[in-house]
Amino acid sequence: MTLAALRPEEVERMIADGAMLLDIRDTDEHARERIPRATNQPLAGIEQLATHSGPMIFHCRSGLRTQTNAARLAAAGEGSPCFVLAGGINAWRSSGRSTIVDQRQPLEIMR
């Protein structure tokens, strides 16, 4: 299964319209750098995802984890429209959009 991949500008527009952006990276990765308004929901606990009536957009660092786990993410979305941020936070940053960086946090494990 694959989920539709969205460009950063599409994700930004959908967030403004009420979509939920979910960062499936581990907590340490999210603490180090994150997209504003993204909620951390590590992949390891994705089955405990809170329900959301609107669209859900998942992201990771590069897009590999979201695409590899697309079926699992769609199941966790419980019928909500589900998408992925193509290229993950790397694409978001490369498009010139801001991220929140906390240099005090240790470097993430998934490098």
Summary of predicted features, one role per range:
Residues 1-20, 24-56, 64-111:
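Rhodanese-like catalytic fold shared by cysteine-dependent sulfurtransferases
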Residues 59:
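Short, surface-exposed ligand- or partner-binding patches at beta-edge/loop junctions that are enriched
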